[in-house]
Amino acid sequence: MAMNFVTFNQDYSYLAVGNIAILEMLFSTSLVALILSPRRLQITNTKRQSTICELTFPTTVLAVRLNRKRLVIVLEDQIYLYDIQTMKLLYTIETSPNPNAICALSPSSENCYLAYPLPQKAPPSSFTPPSHAPPSSAHISPTSGEVLIFDTLKLEAINVVEAHKSPLSCLAINTEGTLLATASDKGTIIRVFSVPDAQKLYQFRRGSMPSRIFSMSFNITSTLLCVSSATETIHIFKLGHQDPSEDLPTSPIGTDSRKTNSTPRERAFSQGSSTLSGGDNSPTDGDPSDISSRKHNGTLMGMIRRTSQNVGNSFAATVGGYLPKGVTEIWEPARDFAWIRLPKTAGYGGPGSNAGPVRSVVAMSSNTPQVMVVTSDGNFYVYNVDLSKGGEGTLTKQYS
């Protein structure tokens, strides 16, 4: 059987695999949403082996999200919201072109938020299309990584998160609906914001080289964030205060790596010249005082940018202690707490690697310190992770 779609349910207790376009479960219930043909949705009761309802949409269904209150259907330029109890259409959202169906629905029934790329209005045009031409879209593809947070219970947009300077590639919301993780199409920086007030809480560095982010997942207690990408390394970031004096293991040197014998402050300055160049590494939001500090310290930033590669780590650490928070956070995102190295496969450097990277979906077990990884080449891996020391996870189970 060809594997066309794979996903975990909302609490990561079940894994759904199918040879159809889309398959989504509602927690551990018998309710399953199926996309059997591009525009047709079927809601099925697997216990009774009966079809509850079928819906047809004007264009291809790209994603389905559901919790105990809402069913969300994502098309390329529209999002449909349904009451999952009655299957009544509640609201239709017009979006910018979203061919990758980037969106996240909170599993929570109370904090029932939907996150998706902020629609970007098309600029006015003086060109008048002929009468027989189809109507032009009111939105264009996003050029930045802003996220709109929509309350699916009140049916209203409640906030905008200025997450990244480049377009988004992945979004994830935690179990309680209080945290939002974001990644841009560069994939070097992962950010975590509070929901619904959109305050930036954490900023992590996945690696120094751009890479497509395939999957992000919070653990059930929202203390860890797991991220998979087009590289063979799965990164696990710790949410919460980390003591800079802690001597944690570090992931191997490479595109997803860092220096292994330096302090967090020294590591920050070792990459200062590259991160100060802007792009996805620069924060796009912050307190007004932080922004003001950056403006008034522009000369100092320029000096450090030119000389950071030539100064010693001890001097860099001393200077770094005097920099305002708004400046230091530009090049000081936290590194991974733990990591996993997937086995070499056809998509990760093995024979036939020209086929392209293997896509992966990650989740963390709700009752054991384990990370579950499913890859598009049909492998299911389970890794143990040391929650006290971090470091590299160990492979304990493998299925194919």
From Swiss-Prot:
Pfam families: PROPPIN (PF21032). WD repeats lie at residues 163-203, 208-247, 295-341, 353-393. Its main location: membrane. InterPro entries: PROPPIN, WD40/YVTN_repeat-like_dom_sf, WD40_repeat_dom_sf, WD40_rpt. It comes from the Eukaryota. One of its GO terms (biological process) is protein transport. It is a peripheral membrane protein. Belongs to the WD repeat PROPPIN family. This is Autophagy-related protein 18. The lineage of its organism: Eukaryota, Fungi, Dikarya, Ascomycota, Pezizomycotina.
